[in-house]
């Protein structure tokens, strides 16, 4: 674990440019730390098991698997049955976290699955940048990643959620990510998909309050034997909501890169605007 951290430069990054770091190997969280000055702002950053059984349990239970219920699809049901690990973040009202939090997930076991759950709540007027990194060694048998991410962005709050996925080419990456954005709030998805044998990944933004905004920026690189099926979903469910979807894909050596986007505008979403570019 220490060697992997050193190769990734995480110890140096934690000291210089990260507000907190979490790490998960296979099904277990092995490290979690947050800077004292960030903790003093009231920011909570801990592993999911501790959050569910600690002083924040009521808040966690109110939000856990509410955006992605087990009935959503078969991999959500599998996740709900066997999940382990992941991160819980809460940013209090009006707090701006100046430097990012980061979680790193590594699936090290041969022929195994990883089912971490990430839950982030950014309260009214707060601001956070969260970075997620994923990797795994290469084996000659399939591995499965079916994690879940639930993001709650309060009134006039902002969350940037950045992901770099560099799984090995024996990985089936079937992650589900969803954000609920209230009035005047903003969710920014930044996604880089470079690894795995097969990926199906479509982060979803539900714009539930007047003036809520979603922006998705994605880059996909599919090489030999890779099938990367990615994109973004947006639901405009309130007036004057706006969304931008901007993606670029590269394929080489027979790799397959597929882009899918879905933008839904409900009857409540008067004067909604959306732009999709790929």
Predicted ranges, named:
Residues 18:
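Residue-level "edge-of-site" marker
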Residues 3, 7, 11-12, 25-278:
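Conserved beta-strand/loop scaffold segments within soluble protein domains that form the structured core
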